[in-house]
Amino acid sequence: MVLADGRIVNASAEENPDLFWAARGAGQDFGVATELVFKAYPQSNEVFGGVLYFSLDKLPDIVDFVNGFEHQTTGNEGLFFGFDRPPIVEKTMILTILFYNGSETEAREFFQPLLSLAPTVNETEMMPYIRMNTLMNKAAKFGGRKRISGTNFTLPLDIKLLEELCQDFDNIMKTYPRVNQSALMFELLPYNEVIKVPNDATAFMNRGRYYNVASIFCWHAPEIDSKMKSLQQSMMQKIGERAGIARSPHLGDGTGLYANFVGHDASAKDLFGDSLPRLQELKMKYDPTNVFRKWHDLFDHKNVV
C-alpha cells in the first residue's frame, strides 16, 4: 500500500498487522493498494447453474422455495431471484439464477421445485465455475446512466412484500423511458462460512445471518436522475424495514451495510459500527492529516464515538 506520506508498505498478518486489519473493510481511508495477494482454492469440477425466467404468477411458489432455502442448503448451493424486464418480451418477469457445486443430478433434485414450474426461459446447464461470474454481464450494457444500491434481508420473506415490490418495479418500468435494463435481485448465498469469522477480526463489519439484496437502476435522461435515486432508495428502505435485520436484531451483530451499495448515503459510524474507534486510532498513525477521506471520512462530525 502507498500511504499518505508516500511510504510503500506491506500489510499482512506478519507485516503491519494493524494496517492489514484496517485495510480489510476500510482500505479506502488508509492508502492506495498497488498489489493484492489472494488465497485461492482449487475448483476443478464443473458446476450446475444458469438463468431461469418465470411469469409473475409463479411468484408465490418461488417465494415458498426461497423461504425453505436456509434449511435445505448444504453450502454448495446459491440462488439469486428478483425482477427484470428482458428485451425479448418487454415485460416484467421473475429472474432467477441457480448455482450448485456438484453433479447435475444432485442439482436438479435440489432445485426441482423451481425447475418444475415450467420456466419461460431455461438456460441452466453444467458449466466451468468461472463462467458463473459472467451470467449477469448482459444485465447492464455500456452507456446510459446507472445507479447501484442495496440493503439486507432475512428469511422468511413475506409474499405480500414481494408482490408490492413487483408492482413497484413494474410501475417504474412502465412510467419512465428507457429504464428496461434495471433489475432488483435478492442474493441467497450461504453465510455459514462467513459468520465463522468474527466481526471484529477485520474492519469489515457486515457479517451475520442475513443476505444482500441489490438493485441496479438504468436510464438515459439526465432530467430524471433525482427521481431514479428517490425511487430506488424508497424501494431499498421498504425492504430494509420490512425484511431486513432491523426486524430481527438477534441474527448477528453485523451492521447490515455493504459499502458498495450504500455509497455516500451512510456515515462511517453506521458502516463500521464498533470498529470505528480503533479505525480512528489507526488513522492517526497511518494518515494523521486525513488525506484519504473522500468516501467515508472517519473524522466527519457524524462519526463521533
Please annotate each region the language model reported.
Residues 1-305:
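Soluble FAD-dependent oxygen oxidases
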